[in-house]
Amino acid sequence: MNLLRKIVKNRRDEDTQKSSPASAPLDDDDLWLPPPEYVPLKELTGKKNMRNFCINGRVKVCSPNGYSFRILRHILKSFDEIYSGNHRMIGLVKVVIGLALSGSPVPEGLNWVYKLRRTFIFQWADSRGPLEGEELEYSQEITWDDDTEFVGLQIRVIAKQCHIQGRVWCINMNPRACQLWSDMSLQTQRSEEDKDSSLLLE
């Protein structure tokens, strides 16, 4: 069984790079676990610990031989250990990655680019999550290489607190996004007046 080498390059600071080796068996297809800092839909109460964020997310998949979501799960399964951004917002980043990857990629040479530009309302359990007024600008490159295959992920998430208005209605996000999370349904409410505004409930 081949050992997979994972090299993480931290681009949060352009002058700084960080690497972290790891290994995983090829036949291991575990899904991500849902981020525990999010409040389950049935526990949603009032507006406590809610934060509105205008999200600009971009995930670029670099692979000369194509890729599958199984490989992406291999890369992302240890995301908690290699994440280089603000840890109060790691759950937000996970959800943005999942939602971005549920969309249609735009080819860019031998690469595929997934983009997400939405306004979400997040609610965190207890006192978890970002502070009032806190924002995020996160960028990181994750590379997966087993000497026979190479897949790189370039992740960029910008989250700025903002305000949205209008009535909302319930929808379910593309199930492909949920494939990255075990036993998790990404349920949202979307504004009738603004198709890019959603309330992320779970």
Swiss-Prot record:
Q: What are the GO cellular component annotations?
A: host cell cytoplasm; host cell endomembrane system; membrane; viral envelope; virion membrane
Pfam families tied to this protein: Rhabdo_M2
Q: Which Gene3D superfamilies match?
A: Rhabdovirus matrix protein M2
Q: Where is this motif: PPXY motif?
A: 35-38
Q: Give the main localization category.
A: virion
Q: Which domain of life is it from?
A: Viruses
Q: One MF term in GO for this entry?
A: structural constituent of virion
Enumerate the residue ranges of region (Essential for glycoprotein binding): 115-151
Regarding the membrane, this protein is recorded as:
Peripheral membrane protein
Site (Involved in the inhibition of stress granules formation and contributes therefore to virulence) residue list: V95
Q: Which comment does the entry carry about domains?
A: Late-budding domains (L domains) are short sequence motifs essential for viral particle budding. They recruit proteins of the host ESCRT machinery (Endosomal Sorting Complex Required for Transport) or ESCRT-associated proteins. Matrix protein contains one L domain: a PPXY motif which potentially interacts with the WW domain 3 of NEDD4 E3 ubiquitin ligase (Potential).
What's the further remark here? Answer: Most abundant protein in the virion.
How is this protein organized at the quaternary level? Homomultimer. Interacts with nucleoprotein and with the cytoplasmic domain of glycoprotein. Interacts with host ATP6V1A; this interaction plays an important role in virion uncoating after viral entry.
Q: What family does this chain come from, according to its entry? A: Belongs to the lyssavirus matrix protein family.
Q: What does it do?
A: Plays a major role in assembly, budding and uncoating of virion after membrane fusion. Completely covers the ribonucleoprotein coil and keep it in condensed bullet-shaped form. Inhibits viral transcription and stimulates replication. Plays a major role in early induction of TRAIL-mediated apoptosis in infected neurons. Inhibits the integrated stress response (ISR) in the infected cell by blocking the formation of stress granules.
Q: What is this protein called in UniProt? A: Matrix protein
From which source organism is this entry?
Rabies virus (strain SAD B19) (RABV)
Q: What is the lineage of its organism?
A: Viruses, Riboviria, Orthornavirae, Negarnaviricota, Haploviricotina
Q: Which gene is this protein's source?
A: M
